[in-house]
């Protein structure tokens, strides 16, 4: 335990909190251009072909972003919006593509959790 005199001379150092999404630079979303759209396999014990894309952001960062939902229309040079949120079984993927924003379409025939996949309310 430090004495009061020691604390007067040298105050306690503040702990620096490390961000999980450094490329966003404290913004809720960032815009970027797809440089590569591909599939990758998850860690054990899962098995699938996860859709991901490499994105060059407006601030110069190049990150990998996960494309959620069934089917997508992304290709190279598509302009997309990314948000934070990692994918637990894909190492190095710390961002999600926002569906239904910019060049990324919403998920076709989606009925539930529509707001997360950029789908408008169906007509009655």
Swiss-Prot record:
One of its GO terms (molecular function) is rRNA binding. The modification 3-methylthioaspartic acid is found at residue 89. The keyword RNA-binding applies. Pfam families: Ribosom_S12_S23 (PF00164). PROSITE patterns: RIBOSOMAL_S12. InterPro entries: NA-bd_OB-fold (IPR012340), Ribosomal_uS12 (IPR006032), Ribosomal_uS12_bac (IPR005679). Part of the 30S ribosomal subunit. Contacts proteins S8 and S17. May interact with IF1 in the 30S initiation complex. Belongs to the universal ribosomal protein uS12 family. The gene is rpsL. Disulfide bonds: none annotated. With S4 and S5 plays an important role in translational accuracy. This is Small ribosomal subunit protein uS12. Keywords: Methylation, Ribonucleoprotein, Ribosomal protein, RNA-binding, rRNA-binding, tRNA-binding. One of its GO terms (biological process) is translation. One of its GO terms (cellular component) is small ribosomal subunit. Signal peptide: none annotated. It comes from the Bacteria.
């Amino acid at each position: 335990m430090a004495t009061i005199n020691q604390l007067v001379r040298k105050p306690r150092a503040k702990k620096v909190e490390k961000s999980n999404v450094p490329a966003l630079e404290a913004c809720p979303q960032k815009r970027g251009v797809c440089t590569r759209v591909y599939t990758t396999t998850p860690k054990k014990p899962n098995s699938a072909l996860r859709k991901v894309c490499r994105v060059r952001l407006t601030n110069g960062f190049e990150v990998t972003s996960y494309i959620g939902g069934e089917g997508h229309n992304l290709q190279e040079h598509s302009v997309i919006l990314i948000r934070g949120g990692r994918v637990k079984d894909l190492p190095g993927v710390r961002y999600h593509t926002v569906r239904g924003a910019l060049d990324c379409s919403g998920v076709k025939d989606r009925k539930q959790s529509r707001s997360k996949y950029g789908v408008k309310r169906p007509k009655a």
